[in-house]
UniProtKB/Swiss-Prot annotation:
Short sequence motif named Nuclear localization signal, residue ranges: 15-19
Protein name: Splicing factor 1
Cited Pfam families: KH-I_KHDC4-BBP, SF1-HH, zf-CCHC
Taxonomic lineage: Eukaryota, Metazoa, Chordata, Craniata, Vertebrata
InterPro entries named in the record: BBP-like (IPR045071), KH_1_KHDC4/BBP-like (IPR055256), KH_dom (IPR004087), KH_dom_type_1_sf (IPR036612), SF1-HH (IPR032570), SF1-HH_sf (IPR047086), Znf_CCHC (IPR001878)
Cell compartments where the protein resides: Nucleus
Keyword field: Acetylation, Metal-binding, mRNA processing, mRNA splicing, Nucleus, Phosphoprotein, Repressor, RNA-binding, Spliceosome, Transcription, Transcription regulation, Zinc, Zinc-finger
Function statement: Necessary for the ATP-dependent first step of spliceosome assembly. Binds to the intron branch point sequence (BPS) 5'-UACUAAC-3' of the pre-mRNA. May act as transcription repressor.
One annotated GO molecular function: RNA binding
Main subcellular location of this protein, as a coarse class: nucleus
Region (Disordered): 1-44, 65-94, 325-584, 611-653
Stretches annotated zinc finger (CCHC-type): 277-296
Organism annotation: Mus musculus
Length: 653
């Protein structure tokens, strides 16, 4: 045995290396699977042991597929021989060793997962697991050649393909209609020009599913649809009706109440029979022909209705000034129908004669209505301006009514110049015991001065310049007509006279005791009255007073009581006092007392009338005392009533 430096390693035996966990030379390695227990508890059944082993195998295959450790040996010599290569359309090889190994592992894992689901229904396969692409298919032949009049394809597809989609959803299968007639004529096929799959076969429905149960279920529904289309007519096919209704709903043309059957409590109330009643005369609803208020256009009209309508139409046109006055207006049988006559008036006494007609041509127009150049006041000044012109002053009167006085030429309602004026336009007769008017007083003006310029046919009195217009007097207050122009005395009145005429009919009071002044020289106001009357009688007296003076001066007419040169004035009007003349004495003690107590009171004494302030003075306004006059009771006298026209003399002055 060699010792020392010449010793060889063979002389000393080598030591065995220590085993460590990092040593790669160890052949036995521990496999750790996450989620799997490393210690198996005792007392497991065989099914539990099998489930544990199958789950370990599934986890191992999943790990290999996920990491790509397919177990292919790196040495090509250790590999098995490869089959014939298969290439796709792009020139790539499909059956490589890696592809074949992965496919083999996936099939093995799929088998294990199917077994594990059978052992444990609560088992969940891995997230990357996909079942194999193997599918079960079947064909259902469509007898289109035997029944060409039936649209089987339409029944299977349905509106917008909804029927076919519903079957696929229920059976979890894929249904395709193939064969001859499945594609519409003119529709483009494949882009490469090749035939579609199954195009050369008869018309059929191809059903494909993952399981055979789903395929059988889909095939059964397709056969039921084909049988219903063959045995049931189209108008009685419920499936066809439902498809048409669904198509209308999709197109927006569905009527919900077409096939709706209402229950008794949902039905609407019955309509009223009145709404269904139709009139045979006018065609309206809601009434019968006997209750109809309208007449047919062809119904004959009575002569009385025609005459009444013609009369109303002519009256309307006459008021508008477009037609002559109807014949009934000019008749002398009764008073004319005018807007003024239509106003309500108090009834006249039965003893009074009826007023003459407005349009009568047998009598002449009274002279006081004829205006001439010899009068003191011209026509336009009397009426407050020319026709259509402005008023002449603050006391000017409005225009007369065209329908009564003919203010507008050519109007059908013009007054006849040869006939008498209407009753309210006639002047009152002069009193029996009074003299003529002074130059400043011309008596009551005609009624046409008091009527405003109103439209024709309106029948309404308007207010002119803030002054109330006076309507015509009542029939009971009408003054008697003027005396006739002949020499015969006027007839006595047949009716009751107004109070102021009754007072005039009384005999004049006895003259005062004779004295030198009374017998030789008259009083100042009497001198002025006599002189004025005499001078006015020559040419300044109004025409209507001239006519009365001529009638009084005729030899055949009896002389009136009193001064023959005096023309009587209306009651309540006295001539004005001359300038500088003393005022007349009071008529009595009672009159003096009433003057002191109420200066504006009414006294019917001739001397008291001279003290009444004129209308244009600063005295109290009497605008509201035009008509009717109030009754005034004085001591020792009867109640008197002033005539309605006495208030106008102050205005005219």
């Amino acid at each position: 045995m060699a010792t020392g430096a010449n010793a060889t390693p063979l002389d000393f035996p080598s030591k065995k290396r220590k085993r460590s966990r990092w040593n790669q030379d160890t052949m036995e390695q521990k496999t750790v699977i996450p989620g799997m227990p490393t210690v198996i508890p005792p007392g497991l059944t065989r099914e539990q042991e099998r489930a544990y082993i199958v789950q370990l195998q599934i986890e191992d295959l999943t790990r290999k597929l996920r990491t790509g450790d397919l177990g292919i040996p790196p040495n090509p010599e250790d590999r098995s021989p490869s089959p014939e290569p298969i290439y796709n359309s792009e020139g790539k090889r499909l059956n490589t060793r890696e592809f074949r190994t992965r496919k083999k592992l996936e099939e093995e894992r799929h088998t294990l997962i199917t077994e594990m689901v059978a052992l444990n229904p609560d088992f969940k396969p891995p997230a990357d697991y996909k079942p194999p692409a193997t599918r079960v298919s079947d064909k259902v032949m469509i007898p289109q050649d035997e029944y060409p009049e039936i649209n089987f394809v339409g029944l299977l597809i349905g509106p917008r393909g909804n029927t076919l989609k519903n079957i696929e959803k229920e059976c979890n299968a894929k249904i395709m209609i193939r064969g001859k007639g499945s594609v519409k004529e003119g529709k483009v096929g494949r882009k490469d020009g090749q035939m579609l799959p199954g195009e050369d076969e008869p018309l059929h429905a191809l059903v494909t599913a993952n399981t055979m149960e789903n395929v059988k279920k889909a095939v059964e529904q397709i056969r039921n649809i084909l049988k219903q289309g063959i045995e049931t007519p189209e108008d009685q096919n419920d499936l066809r009706k439902m498809q048409l209704r669904e198509l209308a709903r999709l197109n927006g043309t569905l009527r919900e109440d077409d096939n709706r059957i209402l229950r008794p409590w949902q039905s609407s109330e019955t309509r009223s029979i009145t709404n269904t009643t139709v009139c045979t005369k006018c065609g309206g609803a809601g009434h019968i022909a006997s209750d109809c208020k309208f007449q047919r256009p062809g119904d004959p009209q009575s002569a009385q209705d025609k005459a009444r309508m013609d009369k109303e139409y002519l009256s309307l046109m006459a008021e508008l000034g477009e037609a002559p006055v109807p014949a009934s207006v000019g008749s002398t049988s009764g008073p004319a129908t005018t807007p003024l006559a239509s106003a309500p008036r108090p009834a006249a006494p039965a003893s009074n004669p009826p007023p003459p007609s407005l349009m009568s041509t047998t009598q002449s127009r009274p002279p006081w209505m004829n205006s001439g150049p010899s009068e003191n006041r011209p026509y336009h000044g009397m009426h407050g301006g020319g026709p259509g012109g402005p008023g002449g002053g603050p006391h000017s009167f409005p225009h007369p009514l065209p329908s009564l006085t003919g203010g507008h030429g050519g109007h059908p309602m013009q007054h006849n110049p040869n006939g008498p004026p209407p009753p309210w336009m006639q002047p009152p007769p002069p009193p029996m015991n009074q003299g003529p008017h002074p130059p400043g007083h011309h008596g009551p003006p005609p009624m046409d001065q008091y009527l405003g310029s109103t439209p024709v046919g309106s029948g309404v009195y308007r207010l002119h310049q803030g002054k109330g217009m006076m309507p015509p007097p009542p029939m009971g207050m009408m003054p008697p007509p003027p005396p006739p122009p002949s020499g015969q005395p006027p007839p006595p009145p047949s009716g009751p006279l107004p109070p102021w005429q009754q007072q005039q009919q009384q005999p004049p009071p006895p003259p005062p005791p004779s004295s030198s002044m009374a017998s030789s020289t008259p009083l100042p106001w009497q001198q002025n009255t006599t002189t004025t009357t005499t001078s006015a009688g020559t040419g300044s007296i109004p025409p209507w007073q001239q006519q009365q003076a001529a009638a009084a001066a005729s030899p055949g007419t009896p002389q009136m009581q009193g001064n023959p040169t005096m023309v009587p004035l209306p009651p309540g009007v006295q001539p004005p006092l001359p300038p500088g003349a003393p005022p007349p004495p009071p008529c009595s003690i009672e009159c003096l007392l009433c003057l002191l107590s109420s200066p504006n009171s009414l006294c019917l004494s001739p001397n008291r009338a001279a003290r009444i302030p004129p209308r244009g003075s600063d005295g109290p306004s009497h605008e509201s005392e035009d008509f009717p006059r109030p009754l005034v009771t004085l001591p020792g006298r009867q109640p008197q009533q002033r005539p309605w026209w006495t208030g106008w003399f102050g205005k005219a002055a």
